[in-house]
A protein has these predicted regions:
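Secretory targeting and sorting signals
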Residues: 1-26
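Catalytic cores of phosphodiester-bond hydrolases, prominently lipid phosphodiesterases
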Residues: 27-343
């Protein structure tokens, strides 16, 4: 281990771990009880040559930008090309094909890569796949929540941790399940992907679009549950944007508020503004803090030292984050795979 890596490990251990005597083994913490690190826009070729390398990175969250292309009726993966693919996902659906095939593929191929990689790493730590629907769903073109669920289910099957898994047959809403801390342990989530959905920047700036991804998928979850089909849903919609208090109250109809247990917003806004983020950990909600580098004192957004990453993780764990994200793709798997105790 390099000196800085050792320092980071020691800092993290001292700040966040409790010593276990003798040969006793600590029980695996629940998914809601830890703080981990994710990579913003991990599909970009400048960060990882191949999507499989992003999966190898140790990061606990990887982000995809997706466009619903009404012309081709395909899910495009790109930052700013709604009718084309520009990404590190390969045309590969077998483990032996990874790290070698043509890139710039659609969402289906990104999921194929994940399925193939999963065969090589069946006990990997849980990975949140954050999907930004850049311009929203397009239900009229056959690219709505139902079709998204169908694609994810077809490609990844039982390797997805779904809303119905959190409900477990015991709770009538995701909110009730989260408040009961019904989340599984991290060990129980080995080999699993968890999908988070957020509205996209194009959608948010479109004056003709007032039905954003979060609300549309929230309606979708409510309706599936009412129809006895909640098992079909593959993703958790997130409330986007840092706010004080419970942002669901002012944003959504009361009928869908209980279907939001993921929250996603700028770390500096949460922390530097003094928002009471204990609300999220008290209720066992999943809180993703983005642009973690920007919290005072700011550190590099791309390549901070290992010790700086460890300190930032410890700081934001105390501020009740579940996952902190930045563009730290240059960091090693031992750094990006760090797990801290939340709260």
């Amino acid at each position: 281990m390099r000196v800085l890596g050792r320092m980071a490990a020691l800092v993290g251990a001292a700040a966040m771990l409790v010593a276990i005597p003798g040969n006793a083994r600590a029980a695996s913490p629940k998914f809601s009880e830890t703080t981990t690190i994710g990579t913003h826009n991990a599909y970009e070729k400048g960060k990882y040559t191949y999507w499989a390398q992003a999966l190898d990175s140790g990061a606990s969250l990887l982000e995809l930008d997706v466009y619903a292309d009404s012309v081709s009726r395909r899910w495009r993966v790109s930052h700013d090309k709604p009718l084309a693919n520009d990404n590190n996902c390969e045309y590969a659906d077998e483990p032996s094909e990874l790290y070698s095939k043509d890139r710039n593929q659609d969402l289906g191929s990104c999921l194929d890569n994940m399925a193939a990689w999963n065969q090589l790493h069946p006990d990997h730590a849980p990975i949140v796949v954050k999907v930004e629907m850049k311009a929203g769903f397009n239900n009229d073109a056959g690219l709505g929540p139902d079709e998204f669920d169908t694609l994810v289910s077809k490609k990844l099957g039982s390797s997805v941790y779904k809303p119905s898994d959190l409900l477990g047959g015991s709770y009538s809403s995701l909110d009730a399940a989260a408040k009961a801390n019904a989340w599984p342990t991290r060990d129980a989530l080995k080999g699993k992907f968890v999908f988070e959905l957020i509205p996209g920047t194009v959608e948010e700036s479109n004056p003709l679009d007032s039905y954003w991804t979060d609300e549309e998928y929230g309606d979708h979850l409510r309706d599936l549950y009412a129809a006895g089909r909640i098992g079909e849903a593959q993703a958790f919609p997130a409330v986007l944007g840092a706010a004080n208090g419970d942002p669901r109250t002012s944003r959504y109809d009361a009928s869908i508020r209980p279907w939001f247990v993921f929250f996603d917003g700028d770390a500096a806004t949460y922390v530097n503004s003094g928002y009471d983020t204990s609300f999220y950990s008290t209720n066992h909600y999943i809180l993703i803090m983005t642009d973690a580098y920007g919290v005072s004192p700011a550190i590099s957004s791309t390549n901070p030292t290992d010790a700086e990453v460890a300190a930032r993780l410890a700081l934001l764990a105390k501020d009740h984050a579940s996952i902190i994200t930045s563009d730290w793709s240059a960091k090693s798997a031992s750094v990006l795979g760090s797990v801290a105790t939340r709260g």
